[in-house]
């Protein structure tokens, strides 16, 4: 498609710019005089607005929410537009779900095990437990309907993650089999851990699975590129490392013990550096979202949350209550935390749920509004614009215009034969029968 044809397509689609485009094509002197207001309106109608004001999940201001029941909510995950929490002890409904972190609904589980951890991956929620016989795994495609699955062994499965097409769970018990993996969350296979430490947390990031433990001597970290073969790594201290997360190119682990060193970080999962926590609380969980690491704990007075933009420098935040905050996750603009006990609310949130969806909807609405305004302007000005075009062309009835040729007027020689006009490259001869015109 040549320049003229592209111009024709533009004109056919955007009549509001007729006067400006044609005046440029036919009279180069008009280029400097051309205004861009019409083109600006049209371009605005072609794109969604990306500069809308957005709220953010800051991890600073927290709000208490009412759980579905006063169960011991031990873990929470987010996936497919839903927050899902599981409990280690309950009177009923050992699972609860929420689309916004505010309104929670109890769900029935296939067994009343002590569900210790949950993860989402490949369209599936998978939870693991520390109790039960041959049924320490359950899965759900929607967080509502759950199915019991056979675990590789009856170990105390305390953590699970998903990465590289694989679910990987780790445990605090067992002999040489404290890891199990599954490609689908249904069929599980025992794997040999680097050591028989109490592996209580695992994450995946940058092509690597990283697990941390609360026992062991200088080897409280292990890593694996495939979830099958594991290697011991040196931890910075023999703390009770209870949670690990990956974000912004960094692995960050937190512990419930230690003095001034309850955080450690690593860019590769292998080499770790001690960091100072905001307080010597018993930090039990950490997550990353919206450019922020957030950790929660079960001890401390009014400061059971700490946040960090880089995993290195940490700041204490005020929790809604001094509850036993055991797990935190992030999803769609919202941090959500659950507790196993304490007074008042057993859920707290920070941020605004649905930022992505709301921003998209608002952008689409704004684009539609701008497009409608452009269309109204086009209709109102079309007659006036066409009248101005007639004024720009002295003898439009005597001129045969080919846009593919007309665009060449900006840089070519004009050749005339009767009522027909053509343009050739400067320096070239006019076609036979045509006369060069200045």
Go through each PLM region and give its residues.
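Sec-dependent N-terminal signal peptides
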Residues: 13, 33-44
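A short beta-strand micro-motif
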Residues: 413-417
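C-terminal segment of classical bacterial N-terminal signal peptides
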Residues: 45-54
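N-terminal secretory signal peptides that target proteins for export/translocation
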Residues: 1-31
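Long, low-complexity, compositionally biased polyampholytic IDRs enriched for Lys/Glu and Gln/Arg
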Residues: 359-392
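Residue-level hotspots at or immediately adjacent to binding/recognition sites across diverse folds
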Residues: 56-358
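Short Cys/His-rich micro-motifs in 6-15 aa windows
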Residues: 434-438
């Amino acid at each position: 498609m040549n320049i003229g044809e592209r111009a024709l397509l533009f004109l056919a689609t955007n009549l509001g710019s007729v006067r400006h485009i044609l005046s440029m094509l036919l009279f180069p002197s008009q280029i400097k005089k051309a205004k861009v207001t019409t083109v600006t309106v049209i371009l605005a109608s072609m794109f969604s607005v990306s500069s809308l004001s957005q709220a953010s999940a800051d991890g600073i201001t927290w709000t208490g929410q009412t759980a579905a029941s006063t169960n011991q909510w031990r873990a929470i995950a987010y996936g497919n537009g839903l927050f899902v929490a599981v409990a280690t002890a309950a009177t009923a409904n050992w699972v609860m779900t929420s689309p916004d972190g505010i309104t929670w609904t109890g769900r029935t589980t296939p067994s009343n095990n002590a569900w210790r951890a949950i993860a989402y991956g490949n369209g599936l929620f998978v939870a693991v437990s520390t109790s039960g016989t041959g049924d320490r795994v359950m899965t759900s495609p929607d967080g509502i309907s759950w199915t019991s699955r056979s675990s590789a062994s009856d170990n105390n499965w305390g953590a699970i993650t998903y990465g590289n097409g694989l679910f990987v769970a780790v445990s605090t018990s067992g002999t040489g089999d404290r890891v199990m993996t599954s490609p689908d969350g249904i069929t599980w296979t025992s794997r040999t851990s680097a050591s028989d430490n109490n592996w209580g947390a695992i994450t995946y990031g940058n092509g690597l699975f990283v697990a941390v433990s609360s026992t062991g001597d200088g080897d409280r970290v292990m890593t694996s590129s495939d979830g099958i073969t594991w290697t011991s790594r040196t931890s910075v201290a023999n703390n009770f490392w209870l949670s690990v997360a990956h974000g912004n190119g960094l692995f960050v682990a937190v512990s419930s013990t230690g003095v001034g060193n309850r955080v450690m970080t690593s860019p590769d999962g292998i080499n770790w550096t001690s960091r100072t926590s905001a307080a010597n609380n018993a930090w039990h969980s950490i997550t990353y979202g919206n450019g922020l690491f957030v950790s929660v704990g079960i001890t401390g007075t009014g400061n059971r949350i700490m946040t960090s933009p880089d995993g290195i420098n940490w700041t204490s935040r005020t929790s809604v209550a001094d509850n036993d905050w055991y797990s935190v996750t992030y999803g769609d603009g919202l941090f959500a935390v659950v507790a196993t006990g304490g007074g008042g609310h057993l859920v707290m949130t920070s941020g605004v749920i649905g930022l992505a969806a709301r921003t998209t909807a608002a952008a689409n609405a704004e684009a539609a509004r701008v497009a409608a305004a452009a269309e109204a302007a086009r209709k109102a000005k079309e007659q006036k614009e066409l009248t101005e075009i007639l004024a720009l062309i002295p003898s439009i009835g005597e001129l045969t215009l080919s846009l593919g040729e007309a665009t060449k007027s900006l840089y070519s020689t004009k050749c005339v034969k009767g009522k027909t006009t053509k343009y050739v490259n400067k320096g070239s001869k006019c076609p036979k029968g045509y006369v060069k015109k200045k």
